[in-house]
C-alpha cells in the first residue's frame, strides 16, 4: 500500500489503521518504504514532525516535566497563516532547515542530559558476593599451600574474604571461600580458570552461591 500524500486527514487515518498490526510499512524490518512515508509526512507536516521527534527525546522524564498549558490556535493566527499561504510564502522552510533545527534541539537535549548526569556523579559500582568451592585432588594435597595460592590471585575489583574447610568424604576437605567482585571488572570464568591453573593442588572449582550487593 502506498502512503505518499498526506494533504488529507483521511490519509493519516488510513496509515494509522494500516499500522495497527505492523511495525513497518513493508516486511519485518525498516526499508526505504518506511523512509518514503516518513518523508512524505514530514513534508506535509514539518513542524509537527519536528515537535514530535523533539518531545520523544523526553520520554524517560515525562513524569518529571513541569505543568503547562496547551495553547489553542487563535482565529487571527489561522487567518494570518492562510493569507501568507495565499501569497506563496514558505511558512516552514525547507526540509533541510527542519532537520537542522531538530538536530540542534537534539544536541541541546543531549548536552542537558549529560550535564544533569554529571551533576549527580557516578553511580556506585555493581558488586556481587560469591562463594567459591575449590576441590583438591585427594587427602594428601597440601591445603595450606592451596589456600595461599588462591589468595595470591589478584584482579582489579576482586576482594577475598573468609574461608572454611568442608569435609567431602574419605578424609578430603574442600576449600569454601567468600569473595566480593565488581561485576564490570571481574569475570568469574576467568577467576575460576586462574584458580584451576594451580594443577598441583586444585582438581576443580564451582560457584556455590552468588548474590548481588
Curated annotation (Swiss-Prot):
It comes from the Eukaryota. PROSITE patterns: EF1BD_1, EF1BD_2. Gene3D superfamilies: 1.20.1050.130, 3.30.70.60. It holds the Pfam family Arc1p_N_like. CDD domains: EF1B (cd00292). The keyword Hydrolase does not apply. The keyword Cell membrane does not apply. Residues 67-88 are annotated as: Disordered. GO terms for molecular function: guanyl-nucleotide exchange factor activity; translation elongation factor activity. GO terms for cellular component: cytosol; eukaryotic translation elongation factor 1 complex. EF-1-beta and EF-1-delta stimulate the exchange of GDP bound to EF-1-alpha to GTP. EF-1 is composed of 4 subunits: alpha, beta, delta, and gamma. PANTHER family: EF-HAND AND COILED-COIL DOMAIN-CONTAINING FAMILY MEMBER, ELONGATION FACTOR 1-BETA. This is Elongation factor 1-beta. It comes from Candida albicans (strain WO-1) (Yeast). The lineage of its organism: Eukaryota, Fungi, Dikarya, Ascomycota, Saccharomycotina. The gene is EFB1.
Amino acid at each position: 500500500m502506498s502512503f505518499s500524500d498526506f494533504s488529507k486527514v483521511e490519509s493519516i487515518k488510513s496509515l494509522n489503521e494500516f499500522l495497527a498490526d505492523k511495525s513497518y510499512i513493508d516486511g519485518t524490518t525498516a526499508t526505504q518504504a518506511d523512509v518514503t512515508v516518513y518523508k512524505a509526512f514530514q513534508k506535509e507536516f514539518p513542524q509537527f514532525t519536528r515537535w514530535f521527534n523533539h518531545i520523544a527525546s523526553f520520554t524517560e522524564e515525562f513524569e518529571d516535566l513541569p505543568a503547562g498549558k496547551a495553547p489553542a490556535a487563535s482565529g487571527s493566527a489561522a487567518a494570518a497563516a492562510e493569507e501568507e499561504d495565499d501569497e506563496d510564502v514558505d511558512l516552514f522552510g525547507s526540509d533541510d532547515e527542519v532537520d537542522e533545527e531538530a538536530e540542534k534541539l537534539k544536541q541541546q537535549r543531549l548536552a542537558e542530559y549529560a550535564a544533569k548526569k554529571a551533576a549527580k556523579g557516578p553511580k556506585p559500582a555493581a558488586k556481587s558476593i560469591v562463594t567459591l568451592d575449590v576441590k583438591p585432588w585427594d587427602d594428601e594435597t597440601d591445603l595450606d599451600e592451596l589456600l595461599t595460592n588462591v589468595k595470591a590471585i589478584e584482579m582489579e575489583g576482586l576482594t577475598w574474604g573468609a574461608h572454611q574447610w568442608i569435609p567431602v568424604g574419605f578424609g578430603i576437605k574442600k576449600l569454601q571461600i567468600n569473595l566480593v567482585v565488581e561485576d564490570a571488572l571481574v569475570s568469574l570464568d576467568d577467576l575460576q580458570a586462574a584458580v584451576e591453573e594451580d594443577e598441583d593442588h586444585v582438581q576443580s572449582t564451582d560457584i556455590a552461591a552468588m548474590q548481588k550487593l
